[in-house]
Amino acid sequence: MAKRNGSPERRKHKRLKVKEGSIAISIPDSKKLGQIKDISKGGLAFQYLGSVEQAKNSVEVEILSIADDFYLRKLPVRTVLDVEINNPVSLSLLPKRQLSMQFGKLNHYQKELLNHFLQRYTHR
Protein backbone atom coordinates (compact mmCIF):
# COMPACT_ATOMS: atom_id res chain seq x y z
CA MET A 1 0.00 0.00 0.00
CA ALA A 2 1.38 3.45 -0.88
CA LYS A 3 0.98 6.69 1.02
CA ARG A 4 -0.46 9.79 -0.62
CA ASN A 5 2.98 11.24 -1.33
CA GLY A 6 4.06 8.10 -3.18
CA SER A 7 6.39 6.68 -0.52
CA PRO A 8 5.78 3.09 0.55
CA GLU A 9 3.53 2.39 3.54
CA ARG A 10 5.58 1.33 6.58
CA ARG A 11 2.81 -0.02 8.80
CA LYS A 12 2.70 -3.75 9.43
CA HIS A 13 -1.00 -3.75 10.35
CA LYS A 14 -3.98 -2.31 8.49
CA ARG A 15 -5.55 0.69 10.24
CA LEU A 16 -9.28 0.33 10.89
CA LYS A 17 -11.79 3.17 11.27
CA VAL A 18 -13.20 3.36 14.78
CA LYS A 19 -16.87 3.68 15.72
CA GLU A 20 -18.10 6.89 17.39
CA GLY A 21 -17.65 7.09 21.13
CA SER A 22 -14.17 5.56 21.36
CA ILE A 23 -11.78 7.84 23.21
CA ALA A 24 -8.00 7.86 23.71
CA ILE A 25 -6.24 9.63 26.59
CA SER A 26 -2.50 10.23 26.54
CA ILE A 27 -0.62 9.66 29.77
CA PRO A 28 0.88 11.51 31.62
CA ASP A 29 -0.53 14.53 29.76
CA SER A 30 -4.25 13.80 30.15
CA LYS A 31 -5.08 17.11 28.44
CA LYS A 32 -4.63 15.22 25.19
CA LEU A 33 -7.83 13.24 24.85
CA GLY A 34 -10.19 12.80 21.96
CA GLN A 35 -12.01 10.65 19.45
CA ILE A 36 -9.94 7.80 18.02
CA LYS A 37 -9.74 8.15 14.23
CA ASP A 38 -8.17 4.78 13.40
CA ILE A 39 -6.41 1.90 15.13
CA SER A 40 -4.52 -1.32 14.42
CA LYS A 41 -2.55 -3.90 16.37
CA GLY A 42 0.45 -1.62 15.89
CA GLY A 43 -0.87 1.79 16.90
CA LEU A 44 -3.58 4.43 16.73
CA ALA A 45 -4.36 8.00 15.77
CA PHE A 46 -6.73 10.33 17.58
CA GLN A 47 -7.75 13.96 17.33
CA TYR A 48 -7.73 16.42 20.21
CA LEU A 49 -7.85 20.15 20.89
CA GLY A 50 -4.52 21.57 22.00
CA SER A 51 -1.60 23.80 21.26
CA VAL A 52 2.01 23.19 20.31
CA GLU A 53 3.02 24.02 23.89
CA GLN A 54 0.92 21.07 25.07
CA ALA A 55 2.50 18.71 22.57
CA LYS A 56 4.70 16.46 24.69
CA ASN A 57 5.68 12.90 23.98
CA SER A 58 3.34 10.48 25.67
CA VAL A 59 4.51 7.36 27.45
CA GLU A 60 1.18 5.55 27.65
CA VAL A 61 -2.31 5.75 26.21
CA GLU A 62 -5.65 4.61 27.59
CA ILE A 63 -8.58 3.59 25.41
CA LEU A 64 -12.21 3.65 26.45
CA SER A 65 -15.67 3.42 24.97
CA ILE A 66 -18.30 5.82 26.25
CA ALA A 67 -21.01 3.45 24.99
CA ASP A 68 -20.23 0.77 27.59
CA ASP A 69 -17.70 -0.24 30.23
CA PHE A 70 -14.71 -0.96 27.98
CA TYR A 71 -11.48 0.50 29.38
CA LEU A 72 -7.96 -0.46 28.30
CA ARG A 73 -5.33 1.02 30.60
CA LYS A 74 -1.67 1.91 30.31
CA LEU A 75 -0.71 0.80 26.81
CA PRO A 76 2.95 1.72 26.22
CA VAL A 77 3.34 4.00 23.19
CA ARG A 78 5.78 6.08 21.23
CA THR A 79 4.60 9.32 19.64
CA VAL A 80 5.10 9.12 15.88
CA LEU A 81 3.46 12.37 14.80
CA ASP A 82 1.57 15.25 16.44
CA VAL A 83 0.30 17.75 13.87
CA GLU A 84 -2.24 20.53 13.60
CA ILE A 85 -5.06 19.71 11.21
CA ASN A 86 -7.26 22.12 9.31
CA ASN A 87 -10.61 22.62 11.07
CA PRO A 88 -12.40 25.59 9.45
CA VAL A 89 -15.68 25.19 11.40
CA SER A 90 -14.27 24.91 14.93
CA LEU A 91 -15.64 27.23 17.61
CA SER A 92 -12.70 26.44 19.88
CA LEU A 93 -9.83 28.83 20.46
CA LEU A 94 -7.48 25.85 20.55
CA PRO A 95 -6.35 24.27 17.29
CA LYS A 96 -7.39 20.74 16.40
CA ARG A 97 -4.46 18.32 16.32
CA GLN A 98 -3.94 14.69 15.39
CA LEU A 99 -1.69 12.47 17.46
CA SER A 100 -0.36 9.25 15.90
CA MET A 101 1.17 6.67 18.23
CA GLN A 102 2.91 3.33 17.85
CA PHE A 103 2.27 0.72 20.54
CA GLY A 104 5.24 -0.57 22.48
CA LYS A 105 5.56 -4.09 23.89
CA LEU A 106 2.12 -5.20 25.11
CA ASN A 107 1.59 -7.93 27.67
CA HIS A 108 -0.75 -10.85 26.94
CA TYR A 109 -3.73 -9.25 28.72
CA GLN A 110 -3.29 -5.96 26.82
CA LYS A 111 -3.10 -7.84 23.51
CA GLU A 112 -6.32 -9.72 24.31
CA LEU A 113 -8.18 -6.52 25.21
CA LEU A 114 -6.83 -4.73 22.14
CA ASN A 115 -8.04 -7.61 19.93
CA HIS A 116 -11.45 -7.38 21.62
CA PHE A 117 -11.53 -3.63 20.91
CA LEU A 118 -10.58 -4.20 17.26
CA GLN A 119 -13.38 -6.77 16.86
CA ARG A 120 -16.10 -4.80 18.61
CA TYR A 121 -15.41 -1.10 18.07
CA THR A 122 -14.10 -0.82 14.51
CA HIS A 123 -15.70 -0.79 11.07
CA ARG A 124 -14.65 -3.78 8.99
State each model region's role.
Residues 21-26, 55-72:
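Short conserved beta-strand and strand-loop elements enriched in small hydrophobics
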Residues 2, 89-124:
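C-terminal output/interaction extensions
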Residues 41-42, 81-88:
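Short, conserved beta-turn/loop elements at beta-strand boundaries and strand-helix junctions
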Residues 33, 87-90:
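Short beta-strand/turn micro-motifs at beta-sheet edges
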Residues 1-52, 115-124:
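N-terminal helix initiation/capping motif
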Residues 14, 53-55, 69-71, 91-96:
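A generic structural micro-feature
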Residues 59-61, 75-77, 99:
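Hydrophobic residues positioned within well-ordered beta-strands of beta-sheet architectures
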Residues 33-36, 73-83:
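Short beta-strand-centered aromatic/proline hotspots
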